[in-house]
């Protein structure tokens, strides 16, 4: 997914501007230090990288993984707790 597609997804999925601002702020935190803000370790992604979840709001989470060797953060899902965790 390109950056433009990601922006469109966020706008379509989260019509509330305040929530989008929280998502943007949380993504900035992840860029600055992805390990510092990891709240919940979830195992490993399909590439063997450690996966984490970070809370954006009470119900919205960002599911991501980190490739520590290449300093890359992969965003797997942004959504409600139910959508991200499937329950």
Give the ranges of each region predicted by the language model:
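Basic, Lys/Arg-enriched alpha-helical interface segments
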Residues: 1-59, 67-72, 81-87
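Catalytic Cys-His active-site segments of thiol-dependent hydrolases/isopeptidases
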Residues: 75-77
């Amino acid at each position: 997914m390109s950056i433009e597609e990601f922006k469109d997804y966020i706008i379509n999925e989260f019509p509330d501007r305040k929530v989008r601002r929280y998502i943007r702020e949380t993504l900035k935190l992840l860029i600055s230090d992805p390990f510092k803000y990891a709240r919940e370790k979830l195992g490993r992604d399909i590439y063997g990288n450690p996966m984490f979840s970070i809370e954006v709001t009470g119900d919205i989470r960002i599911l991501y993984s980190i490739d520590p060797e290449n300093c890359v953060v992969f965003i797997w899902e942004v959504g409600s707790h139910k959508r991200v965790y499937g329950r």
